[in-house]
Every structure is written in structure tokens, then in C-alpha cells.
From Swiss-Prot:
Source organism: Escherichia coli O127:H6 (strain E2348/69 / EPEC)
Protein name as it appears in the record: Protein-methionine-sulfoxide reductase catalytic subunit MsrP
Family per record: Belongs to the MsrP family.
Reactions catalysed according to its record: L-methionyl-[protein] + a quinone + H2O = L-methionyl-(S)-S-oxide-[protein] + a quinol; L-methionyl-[protein] + a quinone + H2O = L-methionyl-(R)-S-oxide-[protein] + a quinol
GO cellular component: periplasmic space
Stored SUPFAM superfamilies: Oxidoreductase molybdopterin-binding domain (SSF56524)
Length: 334
């Protein structure tokens, strides 16, 4: 695998900063403006994060043992870990970016069960300890591009999904991989209350083609910044597919099912004209309500430091993944 030379020092992002462009979709689902919070409050919250970290630190995760393969390392300075764990998209805990850090402490991540089933010869069940001990862990510094036109760089820790799927031995009928988040409304307020959770249908579900899932870049992620994932980042295990928009990165996974048919996905169900199944980062295919040609690389400085730069096809991973889509119309299959 080639080293990711496209990363520059300016690419390293202040993980704290997100933009809330999907609020209009949530309104279309019947969520009132009041329930989505007042604009002034949202703006004040965003600006408070640009000014600096004045929030309580996220609970410290357990330190992990992992390697640092040269292909996924660089000399870039990373932004403080408390910001990536303090400003998140995880609607099961609320719509505002600070809600997951405030509310996700209710999620019990140990014990945990992850089942691999469907079109496999050997169904598997992993427990909490298996997630960090069954496979060698490695740190990978990946770019992440949100569909909302911001981007960041994160040192995720995990293992390639293909190693897990190989143990289950996919059958010849397996064409897709379906993922499902835990359904625990007593722990996740957004699953109880549609005003908190944006009116989405829960549990959150996602999917990949089998060849996408088996690609070496696709990572089952159990840690970040050297430690186990905190709940607000998708503990104890989440998916990272770095050439796709961030909503493909399903969190707190309890089920992986191999299927012969394309599985449903949450945002595609909510707004099929806006969020496709593939969700490949593509500067030539705009969102219906904003351009995807450029993105905000948001650093650790103040709000005036935020600048736009061109979005890279497949988020800069075209050399590795473009062959997966040879002959596919990327405008039709967005």
C-alpha cells in the first residue's frame, strides 16, 4: 500500500469543528425549528469551540497496544484529542455537535457482542475483549471528509475489516455487507425521542459492497489517539471507510451481516435524493443544496484561520480505490 503523500501539515484538522447542514433534512422529516435549537445558541456553541477548549475533557479511554505501519504514518502534528471527542455527529445522543459528549456516558460498552452472520460459512460472535485482542491493532492516520463539506485528519486505531470477514468465510452468494448500530433506547435518548434523534429510523444501518468491505483501507476502528474509543466516537467499535463521506462510518456496531441484496442505509432512507448508497467523496457531484467541489480544512486556530481548498476525488485515495468503480457512472451512483 502506498504511503499517503497527499497529506499536508495544513490538512490536520481541529477535530472539534463541524457544520450542521443536514438540519434542513431533519426539518423535512417533521422536526420543528425549536427542537433543532435556536440559531443564536448554535452559533454561540460553534464559536465557543473556535475560541478554545473550555469544556470538560472527555473520559479517558483505555490505552491500547498497536503498531504504526509506515504506510499510514507521517510527521504531521495532530490536534488535541479532547476536541475530536467533544464535538461529534451521533444523533442517537442529540443533534447538536456537543450533545454526544454530554449524553453518551449512558452507553454501556462492556459487555458487548458483535455478531457476524448471513451469507457466511462460519458465523462469528465477538465479545468486548475480542475487539482489541483478536487481531493486531494498528494506527492509521486517515483523512475524513464529511458530506457537510468539512474535513479533518484523525489517527484511528483498528484492524482491517477483511481480516474479520475472512474468518467468517463469505459464501459465493455474498455481495454486500450490512452493518447495524446497537438499539438501546434506554441508553440512547435519540432513539427514544424523535425530536432528540432527528426523526431518523433507528437502529442506524449502513452497507458496503463486499469488495469495498474487503479493501485494505476499510478499517474496523476501536481506538483514537492511542486509546479506546470514547462512547461519543462510536465505542466500542465503528467503521471507517476513508474514501467515503463520514456518514458511512457507522458507530457502536452490534451486527455485520453478509447479504446477496443491497442493504438499506439510514440517510438514504431519510433523503434518497441527497444521500446515496455509495457516498464516495466526489468534487464533481454536488449535494443538491451545496457544492462538494471544495471543503473546509479546519485547524486548531481561530475562526479566521478556516479556509477552503479543493476536494480530492475519493478523498485523496483514488490511486487505491478508483479501480473498484471502473465502468460505474459516479453521477448516477452517488
Amino acid at each position: 500500500m502506498k504511503k499517503n503523500q497527499f497529506l499536508k501539515e495544513s490538512d490536520v484538522t481541529a477535530e472539534s469543528v463541524f457544520f450542521m447542514k443536514r438540519r434542513q433534512v431533519l426539518k423535512a422529516l417533521g422536526i420543528s425549528a425549536a427542537a433543532l435549537s435556536l440559531p443564536h445558541a448554535a452559533h454561540a456553541d460553534l464559536l465557543s469551540w473556535f475560541k478554545g477548549n473550555d469544556r470538560p475533557p472527555a473520559p479517558a479511554g483505555k490505552p491500547l497496544e498497536f503498531s504504526k505501519p509506515a504506510a499510514w504514518q507521517n510527521n504531521l502534528p495532530l490536534t488535541p484529542a479532547d476536541k475530536v471527542s467533544g464535538y461529534n455527529n451521533f444523533y442517537e445522543f442529540g443533534l447538536d455537535k456537543a450533545d454526544p459528549a454530554a449524553n453518551a456516558g449512558s452507553l454501556k460498552t462492556d459487555p458487548w457482542t458483535l455478531k457476524i452472520s448471513g451469507e457466511v460459512a462460519k458465523p462469528l460472535t465477538l465479545d468486548h475483549d475480542d475487539l482489541t485482542r483478536r487481531f493486531p491493532l494498528e494506527e492509521r492516520i486517515y483523512r475524513m471528509r464529511c458530506v457537510e463539506a468539512w474535513s479533518m485528519v484523525v489517527p484511528w486505531i483498528g484492524f482491517p475489516l477483511h481480516k474479520l470477514l475472512a474468518l467468517a468465510e463469505p459464501t459465493s452468494n455474498a455481495k454486500y455487507v450490512a452493518f447495524e448500530t446497537i438499539y438501546a433506547p434506554e441508553q440512547m435518548p435519540g432513539q427514544q425521542d424523535r425530536f432528540i434523534g432527528g426523526g431518523l429510523k433507528y437502529p442506524y444501518v449502513e452497507g458496503l459492497r463486499l469488495d469495498e468491505a474487503m479493501h485494505p483501507l476499510t478499517l474496523m476502528t476501536v481506538g483514537v489517539y492511542g486509546k479506546a474509543l470514547p462512547p461519543q466516537n462510536g465505542a466500542p467499535v465503528r467503521l471507517i471507510v476513508p474514501w467515503k463521506y463520514g456518514f458511512k462510518g457507522i458507530k457502536s456496531i452490534v451486527s455485520i451481516k453478509l447479504t446477496s441484496e443491497r442493504p438499506p442505509t439510514t440517510w438514504n432512507l431519510a433523503a434518497p435524493d441527497e444521500y446515496g448508497f455509495y457516498a464516495n467523496v466526489n468534487p464533481h457531484v454536488d449535494h443538491p443544496r451545496w457544492s462538494q467541489a471544495t471543503e473546509r480544512f479546519i485547524g486548531s486556530g481561530g475562526i479566521l484561520d478556516v479556509q477552503r481548498q479543493p476536494t480530492l476525488l475519493f478523498n485523496g485515495y483514488a490511486d487505491q480505490v478508483a479501480s473498484l468503480y471502473r465502468g460505474l457512472d459516479l453521477r448516477e451512483n452517488f
